[in-house]
């Protein structure tokens, strides 16, 4: 049953294939073998996910890990977005996180439902950023950037990101994005990280490069 649904989904995704898009998009993800990219444009995949998510087969598909294709992982992420129960979401999310193998799938996840559970989710983030999996760490930092930089901001969150130590490019790139975004949203609180050189040189320089002053 599990194998059958995977084959069925793959067939349907190939029906949405755009080879020119595949060739272009694959170049943006050097960690992914081009043969693992089908080439489905995001709007088409979201439309498919919206309909597929209404079926019982969607639950079966989410049990089939690891997935073979990049788009299957993105579909999985889009299905997570449709889960309305927070506790169920966390269970399914933590099954999926270890299998994320690229920045695009990682950053696709926004999980708006966590906005109603920010205190509890913060405990999960603390665990994610201490992971030995680079994309789990990146995901944790991205959640701090997406959900904890406005009214919910506390300087301790920025300290957590600053304390992350990694040699992984895609972890450090997200750290830089975090501080660039934080400068735009919480300038007075974040500028000391730059002025006092609290970040490693690479992250400091990249964050400054990415930062666009709100003025």
Language-model-detected regions and their locations in the chain:
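Extended alpha-helical scaffolding segments
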Residues: 167-197, 201-203, 207
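Histidine/lysine/aspartate-rich catalytic loop segments that bind and position anionic ligands
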Residues: 103-106, 111, 115-161
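Alpha-solenoid helical repeat architecture
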Residues: 65-66, 97-98, 129-130, 164-165, ...
